[in-house]
Amino acid sequence: QYTQILIDSRPIFSSLAGVYGIEQLPANMVDRVEVMRGGGSALFGSSAIAGTINIITKEPVRNSAAISHTTTSIGGSSAFHNTTDINASIVSEDNKLGIAVFGQNTAKDAWDANGDGFTELSKISGQTLGFRGYVKTGLYSKLTAEYHHLEEFRRGGDNLDLPPHEAMIAEQTDHGINTGSV
């Protein structure tokens, strides 16, 4: 509740989105994670009283590309979690220009473990994409640009075919986050 999540030292998620948001970040974009515990992190704002998690994205260092797809059966049932990840980096021969792009598509079926009609795991549909690029303008200087787009729909509870206000119990979030910097 009081932990601020940052991407490249910038706040991306609200307190509520932070509960679910970390799940939207593809691992293939992460270079490292910095954790600052306690009140000293409050300089990042009121959401950071308990601490700050700063996710640093990868900077392009060599030409590369990768794609992967994972399908997981949830609890041995007919519910599945599908994730597709894509990333690529292009760097000029003199290392003065570089760009890294990444993306993830996630689709997870709702799962009712005990058959009571209420989901234990929500249905999720999400997409994440972004890039980080640089131009070295001098021996000790560089201009960096980055963009991140996160979009997710999540629905749990019962009667998933009905609008949330008509269900007995409903959990639903639908958000899109866009951020960038130069």
Outline where the language-model segments fall.
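Exposed beta-strand and adjacent loop surfaces of beta-rich binding modules
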Residues: 2
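Short aromatic-centered micro-motifs
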Residues: 5
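Residue-level detection of beta-strand-connecting loop/turn positions
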Residues: 8-9, 139
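Short acidic/polar hinge/loop motifs at secondary-structure boundaries
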Residues: 10-37
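Outer-membrane beta-barrel translocator/receptor signature
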Residues: 14-16, 29-31, 42-54, 58-114, ...
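Outer-membrane beta-barrel domain signature
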Residues: 20, 40-44, 73-77, 118-120, ...
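Residue-level recognition of strand-loop junctions within catalytic nucleotide-signaling folds
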Residues: 38, 58, 148-150
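Flexible loop and strand-edge segments within Gram-negative outer membrane beta-barrel domains
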Residues: 108-128, 134-136, 140-182
